Amino acid sequence: MGPSWLLWTVAVAVLLLTRAASMEASSFCGHLEYWNSDKRCCSRCLQRFGPPACPDHEFTENCGLNDFGDTVAHPFKKCSPGYCNPNGTELCSQCSSGAAAAPAHVESPGRTHKQCRKKPVPPKDVCPLKPEDAGASSSPGRWSLGQTTKNEVSSRPGFVSASVLPLAVLPLLLVLLLILAVVLLSLFKRKVRSRPGSSSAFGDPSTSLHYWPCPGTLEVLESRNRGKANLLQLSSWELQGLASQPLSLLLDELEVLEELIMLLDPEPGPSGSTAYGTTRHLAARYGLPATWSTFAYSLRPSRSPLRALIEMVVAREPSATLGQFGTYLAQLGRTDALQVLSKLG
């Protein structure tokens, strides 16, 4: 899983959320129609929901359905001020015009009008609302929207309450957040693994334990940190001429090699303090597993672990340089070994 996969996931998430939260009217059908996605045509709201059951109510645009079939509003709404609908037609008309006639079909410019086959209009339901108090409205017979038309249309087939939509979006958001967390965790692990020295070339995680000092060496490290400036200065100008020299040069310079062996090979005895920056730690820097270091130290005193390490590195990587060797010594804080190494310059 890479960054491109993450971008695709985010794009799909945005599209799904846009679809789930879409509140737009139909882009295919007229005001009193809705898009039938199964038959891919426009059906009349009247044929699906029947005429408005309550007086002075009319159809909302596209009967509250979007082009995905989601219910984004109630199919019926109250007439605007000054408009009435006592006969239950599709749209309200001005109250002063007397009995409201059946309204003309409302066209929507720029929309396709492929009509579905006509179906019988369901009978008019009984209005579930109660009349308002006579003093609350100047128009007798006006009906309160306090109960809303939810009860009126909830029994209709295909109706889904708009209050259910946020509940349907919530699981989708949780799944997307979980996927995003997994992707970010995978990228973080890959970044950690790609850091040099984070694990050995042989995949042995135990070698990383040798990179960190034990509690008994904190005082020694403090003294080395105080001389950090001197260490950097030494590695910058005394070893500058040795950076490109091959590591195999040490095998020919026996005097320098012997001094390095005396500095780097020794490890403390059973009662001594824990050492840091020995040949064992240097081998870990070169990516050799801890088992190799244990075997190399088991050959002492007949064979030096440092000499075995240099021979192993040169055989495995002939292009290894003294500059890399000096860098590892500097990282381990072995100023004394760097001073000996500078004798080759």
UniProtKB/Swiss-Prot annotation:
Q: Which GO terms describe its cellular component?
A: plasma membrane
The major lineage groups are: Eukaryota, Metazoa, Chordata, Craniata, Vertebrata
Concerning InterPro entries, the annotation shows:
DEATH-like_dom_sf, IGFLR1
The function of this protein is:
Probable cell membrane receptor for the IGF-like family protein IGFL.
Instruction: Provide the membrane-side ranges marked Cytoplasmic in the record.
Output: 185-345
Q: Which gene encodes it?
A: Igflr1
The record lists the membrane-crossing segments as 164-184
Composition bias type Basic residues, residue spans: 111-121
Lipid bilayer topology = Single-pass type I membrane protein
Q: Can the keyword Glycoprotein be found in this entry's annotation?
A: yes
This protein's name: IGF-like family receptor 1
